[in-house]
């Protein structure tokens, strides 16, 4: 059974739980690595590109703004992943994020 385990990859779904805080993201990345995960997964979106919805009036848009990963933060997180020795992975919500994420 153990020889088949090498075919599996464990992904830590960090998402946006870091709330835009790079220090917190770094702690989560290290915990993911220490837990045996192969990937630390995040989410990239631009609040200005979100469609209008109930989140515009219930406080969620402000939360999304706080948790948004711009190019600089994404690059920092990517570098932390490299330093820790875990693969970086992200879900991208629109084509503008594809442009800069694909370049890191």
Regions found by a protein language model. Name each.
Residues 17-31, 71-72:
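Glycine-rich anion/phosphate-binding loops
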């Amino acid at each position: 059974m153990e020889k088949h385990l090498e075919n599996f990859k464990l992904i830590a779904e960090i998402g946006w739980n870091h709330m835009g805080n790079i220090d917190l993201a770094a702690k989560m990345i290290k915990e993911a690595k220490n837990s045996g995960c192969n990937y630390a997964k995040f989410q990239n979106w631009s609040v200005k590109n979100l469609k209008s919805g109930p989140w515009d009036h219930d406080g969620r848009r402000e939360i999304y703004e706080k948790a948004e990963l711009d190019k600089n933060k994404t690059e920092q997180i990517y570098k932390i992943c490299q330093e820790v020795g875990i693969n970086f992975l992200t879900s991208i919500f629109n084509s503008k994020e594809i442009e800069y994420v694909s370049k890191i």
